């Protein structure tokens, strides 16, 4: 039996890539799409909804969300309230929101996934960085994205820093008496690590984790050149959350 999928934010680039992935997978069935700014009532013979409230009681299994940070939390909670297992690629959630959604998913007996990055290579980068941080506590992150991305730093960079902080010796990176001649020149501070965000046209999603030690350096890098790189992870997420009973944060928990 096919997994019935709703895609919120289907008009965006990630939403369009997700729609094409679902439409070409015989195990998935795209039953509805959501976008508040769409003027048509159908898209490729699929019903279009402008208001998520109209989807209450709709028959579907999974809610895929590629919207905006401003509405992602409300959308995810709405999905859980209505029996849809959420697969969320929108970033910008606070740790408190994630904890609340995890608890609510358990109460609803529904699986779910919030993933800062759906590219398998990016997930591996985070795992490699976590291993390296045990031995190289001096580390900085540079994340680079297209200039339409609304949040900084990226969810992937934050997740990478969180994972490294769990195993890394907590030290302040840089000189103890350093001075920023221009505010923000050293980037954002996360547990003593620095995170730098680059936003330029022509980029998609890229991240470097740079480690330094006496006389040596180690650089880990992942590049997504096309949004199709995320679709393997989205497909995996859709097929896994219907088997689960709790929302997880990070694709690595489903691998």
From Swiss-Prot:
Matching Gene3D superfamilies: Dihydrodipicolinate Reductase, domain 2, NAD(P)-binding Rossmann-like Domain
Spans through the membrane: none
Residues binding NAD(+): 9-14, 35, 89-91, 115-118
GO molecular function, one term: 4-hydroxy-tetrahydrodipicolinate reductase
Active site per database record: 145, 149
GO CC list: cytosol
Pathway note: Amino-acid biosynthesis; L-lysine biosynthesis via DAP pathway; (S)-tetrahydrodipicolinate from L-aspartate: step 4/4
Catalytic activity: (S)-2,3,4,5-tetrahydrodipicolinate + NAD(+) + H2O = (2S,4S)-4-hydroxy-2,3,4,5-tetrahydrodipicolinate + NADH + H(+); (S)-2,3,4,5-tetrahydrodipicolinate + NADP(+) + H2O = (2S,4S)-4-hydroxy-2,3,4,5-tetrahydrodipicolinate + NADPH + H(+)
Pfam families found in the cross-reference section: DapB_C, DapB_N
Principal location listed in the UniProt entry: cytoplasm
Binding of (S)-2,3,4,5-tetrahydrodipicolinate, residues: 146, 155-156
GO BP: any one term: lysine biosynthetic process via diaminopimelate
EC number, as in UniProt: 1.17.1.8
Keywords tagged on the record: Amino-acid biosynthesis, Cytoplasm, Diaminopimelate biosynthesis, Lysine biosynthesis, NAD, NADP, Oxidoreductase
Subcellular localization: Cytoplasm
Catalytic class of the enzyme: oxidoreductase
Annotated family: Belongs to the DapB family.
The protein's role, per its UniProt record: Catalyzes the conversion of 4-hydroxy-tetrahydrodipicolinate (HTPA) to tetrahydrodipicolinate.
Protein name: 4-hydroxy-tetrahydrodipicolinate reductase
Lineage: Bacteria, Bacillati, Bacillota, Bacilli, Lactobacillales
Gene (UniProt): dapB
């Amino acid at each position: 039996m096919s997994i019935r999928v709703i895609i919120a934010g289907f008009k965006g680039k990630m939403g369009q890539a997700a729609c094409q992935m679902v439409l070409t997978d015989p195990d998935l069935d795209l039953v509805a799409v959501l976008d508040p700014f769409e003027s048509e009532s159908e898209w490729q013979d699929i019903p279009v909804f402008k208001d998520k409230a109209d989807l209450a009681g709709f028959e579907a299994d999974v809610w895929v969300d590629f919207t905006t940070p401003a509405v992602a939390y409300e959308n995810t909670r709405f999905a859980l309230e209505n029996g849809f297992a959420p697969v969320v690629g929108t970033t910008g959630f606070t740790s408190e929101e994630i904890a609340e959604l995890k608890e609510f998913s358990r109460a609803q007996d529904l699986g779910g996934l919030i993933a800062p990055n759906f590219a398998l290579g990016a997930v591996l980068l985070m795992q490699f960085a976590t291993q390296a941080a045990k031995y190289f506590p001096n580390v900085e992150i540079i994340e680079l994205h297209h200039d339409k991305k609304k949040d900084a730093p990226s969810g992937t960079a934050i997740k990478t820093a969180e994972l490294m902080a769990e195993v890394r010796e907590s030290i302040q990176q840089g000189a103890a008496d350093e001075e920023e001649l221009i505010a923000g020149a050293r980037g954002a501070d996360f547990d003593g690590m620095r995170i730098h965000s680059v936003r330029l046209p022509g980029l998609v999603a890229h991240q470097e984790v740079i480690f330094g030690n006496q006389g040596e350096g180690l650089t880990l890098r992942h590049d997504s050149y096309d949004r199709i790189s995320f679709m393997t992870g989205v497909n995996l997420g859709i097929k896994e959350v219907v088997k689960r009973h709790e929302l997880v944060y990070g694709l690595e928990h489903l691998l």
